[in-house]
């Protein structure tokens, strides 16, 4: 029986290591990374993980955010109070070296408007023979027709595919291998009663809690740290790799090395080590075959590899090892003699363990040996049967595959023993030579070090990489370090090797003389060894800059050593960036101080706008519930405080203008003050400036980004707006800083603030004050459209209202007020607060959205709580965004009432393939595909819908089930099918272009205009062919989802099931991932293998 106390103690320890808590989907992965086991909630008698966590409130505190994310926090006890205090202080502003970078930071990604898939041109098109049978499983060998084609035996076993594994935000890719090859059954599956690590790694990426009813809900990828088994002593691993290579003197594919490693030592080989072999010349020789693939060949370390340096060859001691035999290229490439032919073919095939097409043999033979293959060699392949296995495909000699003949067990034992004995004899010699070379390197002059070239730092290609802000002197030169596998993780690995090298190598001594600019290895604090560059020199001390951390320090000469060239292959990790939107104030001391206090020593997600030498970026703090734009926050923090409006409690203010009313009753007001007067003066000057100056392209916004402040022209004057959401290169959302209004506009309608006014304009704080009516009865509850309409008609854009402040809630940034119209001031009994409570406006009908409206009143612009309600003036300026869209509303008055449906989307015929994108994947029995060729048209339609519905007048809709509408979901308008009506004002909709089920407020549902009914609905439900399973487990669904969701794939159509409703059509397809350069991954093969593994475990 499991000890519940032990589990709870381990759980508390895991939670205490994360002071900001752990999201519930990531908890299992974090627990397993530290303990090696999953949380056994089922064995403890609980149906779900959450149920178990709620049963131990003394250990776990569970909180649910507004977005619905469940986060777990540790509850400290007396025994662990000291630990809790240390964890609370673990992030300090002090500069530290070594392991101070949190590589596991979660980045909240929003749904991109443009898909993050590869363009269609990069998807390889699989070619299939004309006699293809739908019922027959397609042969993967037919997918490839380039380079060296690798074949498959008719009875070949299916090997596990090489797939990418995600740990936290970092993607580790195994070196791809051919997906099919011959292998004994004994070696195919692990005999252990557990899933293979690659399956476990994929499962650890997502939560193990019970499936949500909404299967389309995005599952956040957890930040799983590598398990303890991946922590190796480097020398032990290197010795083991030497032993493996000594047993395979003819070479071994790097992708096969983890398999042999596990077979011999019963441990997993860290995939990160595979990237280091090119830097270990004393361990192995790395060779890239001429086939053009990414797989590499490894050989035992040879003298030839050791001599590859810029040292004078005279300094290298002579070696007893014979030089490798080289075949010089001959003019005309004469044919090889028959006596040597078979031997060379056998030697060649050893390098292609997955087989080689016979048709590819002549070219491969010539590339390797620089001689031509005999012309009649392929006419009778049976002559090669003594040196290789010939496998004919469909009886066609041209389709034969050649395999190297495996030695018999007895021969293999003798050969391995002989090879091991031979390698043992030369092992000490090789190691002595390598140590001698290292000693010569250490003793080399400073001139040698000047020839070392450090590769430049490559900007990450991922959408939102993480960075650690180190320091800054101005906002145009902020020192940062990228966080990730090829950056901070690679640096940590290198520093471990540096510590190992300099701590244990007694022959390495401190430098005696140094030069400015010279690279050194410095023994810094906490016994860390860091790379540094000399800045200046004093007696006994050197001022160095730590090139991977970006700050400088004076160090003793006794702590400085010459940097070994093997530590020069990694780029300097400290680099600089420029904060977008702050360029004009980059040297302002107040701004620099604010930026430094908010950013230094912290990790942020970064949006890279321009990839230049000093990239232009926007920083986001994603540690809380909402992403915080650091650039915009710093800009607002340096506003002129004397221009802000400070409302006083019980004070009366006159000539107040109500600029915006939201559907929850929130108001935005402008109060006369010094800041408002200066703003109006600046806007008037800008109006005159643009009137006198010709509008050139420099004033158009060429690079929109969130947080950018610019100008928008409406009702004959310029107004300040801040970009809040960029939908695409054409459409975006803006907020009017001085009115509180939010709307969608075209990028082409925005203008840059002229440079001469920019600094003054930024100094003026936003003039829209957020208010709410005070002392409204609690029984009112949700505002009805009628109440919002009455309030709008009463006060919106009235410039001479008055307010009395009763309370200022600084935490929420809202003031509670009594509002008066000019006729009723200052009688409190005739205030708007009293009138609206007495009015018959709060009668919630069975469906408040179908309430009767008098013929004299226009339809109210009712939106959600955070969406503005605009009066006549607001409507006018919104409709002035674009004349084209305005005309489209007038010219299509009947478009709201049509029920015409677009034609069904075109699908390939059975037996044909098509490029698809998978936006949603629940399990192999249900996922959604989109035709890749139509995605661009869908993006254009989405842009047009955003602009159209932002200027069109909202209507009360008598919604009906199973009808098509337009609905606003997460700031975007979608074509939806209404699936159900709930009693709480929400409706269930199905996105016809993306295949997702969503719940939205009925106020966000509008008629679908006729112009948006032309493009076929893009979402097609699909089922995976080639696998049979009545019910897919949660774990299997996760594995499938991680391999196909949000990815462009090639689909081979097996069956198309037609239906009169386009959203009820279904297609049965094979899915193929062609993203890897030399391997096609058939998803049904992978899932079949997974089911076999799962059945063995169960």
UniProtKB/Swiss-Prot annotation:
Keywords: Cytoplasm, Differentiation, Phosphoprotein, Repeat, RNA-binding, Spermatogenesis. CDD domains: LOTUS_1_TDRD7 (cd09986), LOTUS_2_TDRD7 (cd09973), LOTUS_3_TDRD7 (cd09974), Tudor_TDRD7_rpt1 (cd20427), Tudor_TDRD7_rpt2 (cd20428), Tudor_TDRD7_rpt3 (cd20429). Residues 861-1098 are annotated as: Interaction with CDK17. The keyword Coiled coil does not apply. InterPro entries: LOTUS-like, OST-HTH/LOTUS_dom, SNase_OB-fold_sf, TDRD7_LOTUS_3, Tudor, Tudor_domain_containing, Tudor_TDRD7_rpt2, Tudor_TDRD7_rpt3. GO terms for biological process: lens fiber cell differentiation; lens morphogenesis in camera-type eye; P granule organization; piRNA processing; post-transcriptional regulation of gene expression; spermatogenesis. It is found in: Cytoplasm. It holds the Pfam family OST-HTH. Residues 3-76, 233-302, 337-406 form the HTH OST-type domain. Residues 513-570, 703-760 form the Tudor domain. The modification Phosphoserine is found at residues 319, 859. SMART domains: TUDOR (SM00333). GO terms for cellular component: P granule; ribonucleoprotein granule. Its main location: cytoplasm. GO terms for molecular function: mRNA binding. Coiled coil: none annotated. Residues 893-1098 are annotated as: Interaction with CABLES1. Found in a mRNP complex, at least composed of TDRD1, TDRD6, TDRD7 and DDX4. Found in a complex containing CABLES1, CDK16 and CDK17. Interacts with CABLES1, CDK17 and PIWIL1. Belongs to the TDRD7 family. Component of specific cytoplasmic RNA granules involved in post-transcriptional regulation of specific genes: probably acts by binding to specific mRNAs and regulating their translation. Required for lens transparency during lens development, by regulating translation of genes such as CRYBB3 and HSPB1 in the developing lens. Also required during spermatogenesis. This is Tudor domain-containing protein 7. It comes from Bos taurus (Bovine). The lineage of its organism: Eukaryota, Metazoa, Chordata, Craniata, Vertebrata.
């Amino acid at each position: 029986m499991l000890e519940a106390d032990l589990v709870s103690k381990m759980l508390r320890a895991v939670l205490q290591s994360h002071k900001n808590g752990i999201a519930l989907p990531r908890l299992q992965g974090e627990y397993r990374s530290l303990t090696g086991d999953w949380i056994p909630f089922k064995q403890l008698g609980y149906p779900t993980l959450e149920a178990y966590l709620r049963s131990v409130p003394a250990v776990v505190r569970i909180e649910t955010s507004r977005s619905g994310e469940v986060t777990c926090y540790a509850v400290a006890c007396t025994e662990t109070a000291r630990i809790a205090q240390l964890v609370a202080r673990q992030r300090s502003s002090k500069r530290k070296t070594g392991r101070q970078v949190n590589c596991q930071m979660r980045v909240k990604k929003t749904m991109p408007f443009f898909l993050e898939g590869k363009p269609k041109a990069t998807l390889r098109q699989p070619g299939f023979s004309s006699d293809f049978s739908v019922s027959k499983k397609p042969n993967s060998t037919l997918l490839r027709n380039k380079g060296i084609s690798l074949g498959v035996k008719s009875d070949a076993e299916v090997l596990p595919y090489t797939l990418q594994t995600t740990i936290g935000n970092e993607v580790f890719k195994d070196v791809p291998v051919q997906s099919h090859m011959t292998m004994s059954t004994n070696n195919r599956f692990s005999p252990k009663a557990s899933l293979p690590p690659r399956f476990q790694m994929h499962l650890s990426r997502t939560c193990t809690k019970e499936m949500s009813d909404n299967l389309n809900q995005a599952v956040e990828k957890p930040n799983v740290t590598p398990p303890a088994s991946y922590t190796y002593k480097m020398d032990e691993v290197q010795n083991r790799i030497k032993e493996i290579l000594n047993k395979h003197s003819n070479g071994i594919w790097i992708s096969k090395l983890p398999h042999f490693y596990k077979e011999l030592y019963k441990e997993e080989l860290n995939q990160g080590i595979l990237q280091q072999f090119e830097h270990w010349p004393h361990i192995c020789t790395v060779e890239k075959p001429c086939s053009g693939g990414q797989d590499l060949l490894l050989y035992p370390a040879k003298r030839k590899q050791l001599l590859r340096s810029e040292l004078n060859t005279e300094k290298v001691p002579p070696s007893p090892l014979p030089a490798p035999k080289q075949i010089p290229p001959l003019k005309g490439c004469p044919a090889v003699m028959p006596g040597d032919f078979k031997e060379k073919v056998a030697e060649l095939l050893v390098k292609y363990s997955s087989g080689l097409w016979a048709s590819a043999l002549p070219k491969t033979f010539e590339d390797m040996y620089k001689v031509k293959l005999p012309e009649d060699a392929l006419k009778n392949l049976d002559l090669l049967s003594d040196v290789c296995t010939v496998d004919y495909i469909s009886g066609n000699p041209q389709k034969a595959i050649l395999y190297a003949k495996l030695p018999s067990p007895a021969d293999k034992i003798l050969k391995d023993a002989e090879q091991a004995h031979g390698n043992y004899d030369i092992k000490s010699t090789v190691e002595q030579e390598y140590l001698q070379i290292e000693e010569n390197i250490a003793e080399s002059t400073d001139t040698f070090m000047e020839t070392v070239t450090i590769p430049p730092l490559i900007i990450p290609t991922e959408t939102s990489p993480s960075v650690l802000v180190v320091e800054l002197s101005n906002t145009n030169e902020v020192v940062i370090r990228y966080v990730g596998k090829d950056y901070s993780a690679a640096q940590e690995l290198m520093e471990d090797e540096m510590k190992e090298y300099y701590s244990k190598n007694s022959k390495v001594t401190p430098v005696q003389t140094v030069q400015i600019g010279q690279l050194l290895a410095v023994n810094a604090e906490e016994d860390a060894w860091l790379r540094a560059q000399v800045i200046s020199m004093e007696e006994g001390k050197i001022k160095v800059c730590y090139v991977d951390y970006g700050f400088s320090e004076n160090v003793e000469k006794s702590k400085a050593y010459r940097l070994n060239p093997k530590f020069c292959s990694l780029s300097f990790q400290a680099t600089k960036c420029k904060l977008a939107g702050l360029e004009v104030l980059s040297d302002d001391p107040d701004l620099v101080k604010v930026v430094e206090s908010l950013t230094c020593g912290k990790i942020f997600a970064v949006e890279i706008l321009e990839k230049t030498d000093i990239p232009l970026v926007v920083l986001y703090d994603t540690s809380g519930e909402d992403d915080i734009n650091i650039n915009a926050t710093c800009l607002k923090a340096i506003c002129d405080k004397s221009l802000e409006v400070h409302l006083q409690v019980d004070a009366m203010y006159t000539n107040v203008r109500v600029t915006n009313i939201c559907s929850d009753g929130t108001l935005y007001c402008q109060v006369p003050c010094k800041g408002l007067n200066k703003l109006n003066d600046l806007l008037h000057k800008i109006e005159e400036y643009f009137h006198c100056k010709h509008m050139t392209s420099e004033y158009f916004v060429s690079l929109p980004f969130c947080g950018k402040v610019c100008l928008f022209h409406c009702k004959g004057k310029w107004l300040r707006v801040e970009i809040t959401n960029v939908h695409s290169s054409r459409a975006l959302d803006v907020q009017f800083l001085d009115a509180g209004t939010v709307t969608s506009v075209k990028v082409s309608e925005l203008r840059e603030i002229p440079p001469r006014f920019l600094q003054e304009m930024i100094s003026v704080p936003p003039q829209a004050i957020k208010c709410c009516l005070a002392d409204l009865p609690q029984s009112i509850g949700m505002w009805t459209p009628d109440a919002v309409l009455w309030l709008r008609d009463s006060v919106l854009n009235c410039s001479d209202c008055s307010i009395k402040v009763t309370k200022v809630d600084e935490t929420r940034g809202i003031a509670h007020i009594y509002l008066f119209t000019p006729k009723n001031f200052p009688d409190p009994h005739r205030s708007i607060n009293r009138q609206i409570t007495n009015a018959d406006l709060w009668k919630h009908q069975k469906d408040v959205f179908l309430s009767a409206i008098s013929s004299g009143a226009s339809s109210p612009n009712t939106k959600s709580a955070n969406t503005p309600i605009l009066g006549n003036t607001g409507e006018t300026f919104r409709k002035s965004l674009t004349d084209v869209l305005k005309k489209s509303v007038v010219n299509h008055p009947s478009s709201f009432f049509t029920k015409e449906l677009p034609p069904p989307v075109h699908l390939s015929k059975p037996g044909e393939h098509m490029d698809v994108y998978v936006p949603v994947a629940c399990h192999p029995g249900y996922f959604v595909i989109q035709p890749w060729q139509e995605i661009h048209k869908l993006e254009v339609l989405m842009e047009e819908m955003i602009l159209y519905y932002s200027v069109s007048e909202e209507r009360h809709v008598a919604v009906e089930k199973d009808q098509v509408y337009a609905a606003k979901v997460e700031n975007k308008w979608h074509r939806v099918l209404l699936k159900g009506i709930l009693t709480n004002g929400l409706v269930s909709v199905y996105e016809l272009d993306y295949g997702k089920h969503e719940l939205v407020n009925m106020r966000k549902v509008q008629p679908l205009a006729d112009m948006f009914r032309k493009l076929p609905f893009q979402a097609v439900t699909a089922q995976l062919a080639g696998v049979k399973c009545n019910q897919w487990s949660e774990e299997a669904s996760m594995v499938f989802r991680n391999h196909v969701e949000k990815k462009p794939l090639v689909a081979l159509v097996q069956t198309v099931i037609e239906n009169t409703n386009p959203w009820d059509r279904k297609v049965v397809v094979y899915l193929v991932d062609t993203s890897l350069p030399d391997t096609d991954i058939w998803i049904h093969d992978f899932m079949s293998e997974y089911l076999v593994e799962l059945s063995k475990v169960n």
